[in-house]
Amino acid sequence: MNGRIATLMVHTSPLDQPGIGDAGGMNIYVTESAERMAAMGVQVDIFTRRTNKDVADIVEISPGVRVRHLNVGPVDGVTKERLPELIGELSKEFTRMMSEDSYDVIHSHYWISGKVAMPAAEKLGIPLVHTMHTMARVKNLNLAEGEVPEPMIRVQGETQVVAAATGLIANTDAEAASLVSLYSACPDNVHVVSPGVDLYTFTAGAGRAAAREVVGLAQDALVITFVGRIQPHKGPELLIRATSEMIKHSPQLRPKLVVNIIGGASGANTSEVERLKE
């Protein structure tokens, strides 16, 4: 299998540490997918906005997979929420870089990247494949208490991307159904590609006892762990409340119970960490 794919992930970089800021599961998904395609002979360039002045314009992260930086906007201080202000400039720079090279398909991730990719796909006649990952209309239908709704600019942007894309990748049947019912996507353009699991990483290894010894946990501890960016809709507060209820019903569990919350604040939402502590 041969070919070249231009993957676009504007709001976060494969070079960032997942679990901090806006870097999360999407970073891992995009990088791992690119490496699997590269193993089949497809060259993948991942385009992202520069957020580190000390990193080269092009960084090879594995054989056949490179990160290419879009030099648009300030290096520091631009949150994901402010990125829509830069869509026009990002589109121009991405189109320029694309016109100087040759790619068979563009694969954009998240609505901002889809909007950035649309002009290049149209001008250069390259198929645009898009993965939403999350959708504003779905999130707004399932808001946590006190959570701010997604803005209309995102709803409109997602609708435009769905209409412009040659193909749409959904992770689940439910996501595919939402694309059709909430965004009027053509069912023939929606393809469900379920994410896989890297069993070389997610394995029992030397066993539970050895793992507990490494991280300093008692062998008889009852361990509950949350792993992910700390955002209301990911449910860390639900874990804390459930743990509290469990202790009320079974107070004898308290001495052995250990609750781990592993992850950092997401984007500008740093107050959530302090709120959970309280």
What are these regions (language model features)?
Residues M1-H69:
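N-terminal subdomain of nucleotide-sugar transferases
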Residues I5-A6, A121-L141, I169:
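Active-site proximal beta-strand in glycosyltransferases
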Residues S108-S113, M132:
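Short His-centered aromatic/hydrophobic patch
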Residues P149-L168:
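Membrane-proximal helix-turn-helix segments that form the acceptor-binding/catalytic region
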Residues A174, G196:
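Carbohydrate-associated surface elements
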Residues T203-L217:
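A short helix/loop element that forms part of the nucleotide-sugar donor recognition site in Leloir-type
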Residues H249, P255-E278:
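Short, structured helix-loop element that forms part of the nucleotide-activated donor/catalytic region
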